[in-house]
Amino acid sequence: MQPEHVAGANMPNAVGNHDPMMRQTVTVILAGGRGSRLEPLTRDRAKPAVPIGGAYRIIDFVLSNCLNSDMRRLLLLTQYKAQSLDRHINVAWRNYFCRELGEFIDVVPPQQRIDDNWYQGTADAVYQNIYAIEREAPEYVVILAGDHLYKMNYESMVNFHHRKGADVTVGALRVSREEARQFGVMQVDTDNRLVEFQEKPENPRPTLDDPDVCLASMGIYVFNTRFLFERLCDDATQPDSDHDFGKNIIPGAIEDSQVFAFPFTDENRKRDAYWRDVGTLEAYYEANMDLVGVDPQLNLYDRQWPIRSFQPQLPPPKFVFGSEGRSSRRGEALDSIVCQGAIISGGCVRRSVIGTGCRINSYAQVEDSILFDDVNVGRHSRIRRAIIDKGVQIPPETEIGYDLALDRARGLTVTDSGLVVIARGEMIASPVSTNGSHDPTSSLTS
């Protein structure tokens, strides 16, 4: 299955091309995911609002793709603990869209316009917002997931959909057979027409050209608007339906409609295509650690396909205290990302992501870790393989990630791989008791 080359598909920074077809398109972004496997990071925020790479949120990648693809009519469907996401959209994204030119990014919580239920599935979420789509009178509706990391030109997919005369087009990604069990798996003919679709099969069928590779659905769809409305309205009347695009809408459409697969066109400009579902703590951690490498797989430095976000009005990061004689008091960070407003004040940072406003105090060590905004690490503390949420205060002389049994006893989240996670609002008692000695029983309380 080979991607078709279309005019403008590889043009640098497609913003401003103003393809008339994109003006006939409304984009619906599903951003209400609970992200339960990312707990406790999603205890107070939806999965798309989880920070990534220090300066971004997960949602910024799909929104940047939209803007770079000249898609400027966006409906963002939220549901679960959306306040953090709502605030981020307001401060980071509103100014990119001009209402006077018919552009918008609207955050749409469940309206209960049709019945008293919350969203019951991906298809039901769109069904409950047919009114919001219909009033814009689009010819095409693009449906995206708001919780994946990748760089893609959606304009190419819409043009492909139009040329094929498709009713629906599904974004397709080549994955290993082992990975394919977590996806919807497709079979296509020589014209990229879907002939079979299985949702998360136990024994996925490989592609015809490679017995070790499967064609997986990316959860990205282009629909003809009228066709979409008809299928959603019919699905809503089916009591045994899961009201899900992968389980119900797409398999049903294959039987009697023009359904095509569009091969993922990567804008990452690296040797290997990049697409990640950071739905587990380990996957999330590895995606961040990739970014601090010498040559990251995810390219954040490509000015032709920028990833945008909110940039706070803070001073640049600062590193203070150099070695004085034999003292180990030296503010430094190597193989790391350090964001605005952070101060490395005599501490040492290695292979870590340091968020805005963090402070690493004298003689502290942070290794292989992710610190969200405004984390304060006390003197002589040591942190290894940890994810620390926003605003957490680490007392002096505290060790995190060195004694996993102690970390569990404190009430911290410790994964099977030994990754330690401290949630926002949790406090760590000082390891130094009132008489100045180390207290091994100090614990964490909310």
UniProtKB/Swiss-Prot annotation:
Sorted alphabetically, which keywords does the UniProt record give?
Answer: ATP-binding, Carbohydrate metabolism, Glycogen biosynthesis, Glycogen metabolism, Nucleotide-binding, Nucleotidyltransferase, Transferase
Q: What class of enzyme is it?
A: transferase
Superkingdom of origin: Bacteria
- Pathway stated in the Swiss-Prot or TrEMBL entry: Glycan biosynthesis; glycogen biosynthesis
GO MF annotations for this entry?
Answer: ATP binding; glucose-1-phosphate adenylyltransferase activity
Q: What is its EC number?
A: 2.7.7.27
Q: Which residues bind alpha-D-glucose 1-phosphate?
A: 119, 184, 199-200, 217
Check the record and name the InterPro entries matching this protein. Answer: ADP-Glc_PPase, ADP_Glu_pyroP_CS, GlgC_bac, GlmU/GlgC-like_hexapep, NTP_transferase_dom, Nucleotide-diphossugar_trans, Trimer_LpxA-like_sf
Which GO biological process annotations does it have? glycogen biosynthetic process
Residue ranges of coiled coil = none
Among the Pfam families in the record, one is NTP_transferase
Kindly state which reaction or reactions the protein catalyses: alpha-D-glucose 1-phosphate + ATP + H(+) = ADP-alpha-D-glucose + diphosphate
Assembly and interaction partners? Homotetramer.
What family does this belong to?
Answer: Belongs to the bacterial/plant glucose-1-phosphate adenylyltransferase family.
PANTHER family, sorted = GLUCOSE-1-PHOSPHATE ADENYLYLTRANSFERASE (PTHR43523:SF2), GLUCOSE-1-PHOSPHATE ADENYLYLTRANSFERASE-RELATED (PTHR43523)
Provide the function of this protein.
Involved in the biosynthesis of ADP-glucose, a building block required for the elongation reactions to produce glycogen. Catalyzes the reaction between ATP and alpha-D-glucose 1-phosphate (G1P) to produce pyrophosphate and ADP-Glc.
The name this protein carries in UniProt is Glucose-1-phosphate adenylyltransferase
Q: What is the lineage of its organism?
A: Bacteria, Pseudomonadati, Planctomycetota, Planctomycetia, Pirellulales
The primary gene name is glgC
